Amino acid sequence: MHTVTSKDGTKIAYDKVGQGPSLILVAGAFSYRKFPGQVQLAHLLSEYFTVYNYDRRGRGDSGDSPSYTIEREMEDLQAMIDEAGGSAYVWGLSSGAVLALQTAAAGANIKKLALHEPPLVVDDAGHKPPEDFVKRVSVLISANRRGEAIKYFMTKGMGAPSFVVSLMRVMPGVWSRLMAVAHTLPYDAALLDGYMDGKALPEKLWDAVTMLTLVIEGTESPVSLRHGAHALAGNLPNARLLSKKGLGHTKKLDTKKISSELAAFFMGNR
């Protein structure tokens, strides 16, 4: 394990594996650097890249601050980019894709950007979280009701059936990993605030994101995720959409398929 110090003094933990161009992995909600899917993906990509797999603040071995702002998480990613040599390829998953996107828009030196199913809700098709979603997640965590927060985030935020959460509760290894990072769910909710209301993305919203960008979706994914991916690819000035079966993230990451597509994108001319 390595650490880097973010702008506000918070220690950010990361693992570094492989040799080659620098690639930073930005996890989504419920995930962290030791999450099995993250570990597998980092291992597969290490054949081609120096992979930096880090714990977002508040997770795993990373520190945290008394109060959260999106800007602090953006500074964490910038610290990782600096640690990786000042520029890097970046892959972000779900809320991590939104974090990577916001950091890119703020001027980070990202050579190429892969945005994997950012949960943007751009119309009324499919699932849409309730209007008080962000507030309710924070209330549950403030009351230390982690189990309820997990269920609420998954069912109301992600649209998962209640029985799926019930099954996870009786899987000790799975549930313990979720409980360990549940207190950071308000961070993910804050990142998504304003992007899950069913409204079209404003034109030129992310015009500053000029690097080559790959927006990834699985054809098996929920319609709201797919529509969001299509809208984002059309909104960014230098992006293309990759749509294939097996690239979804709502069940289990197919790390072999994903790593293959990421290697082709980051190492290719387009």
Where are the model-predicted features located?
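Helix-rich cap/lid subdomain of alpha/beta-hydrolase
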Residues: 118, 122-175, 188-189
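Conserved serine/cysteine hydrolase catalytic core
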Residues: 177-234, 243
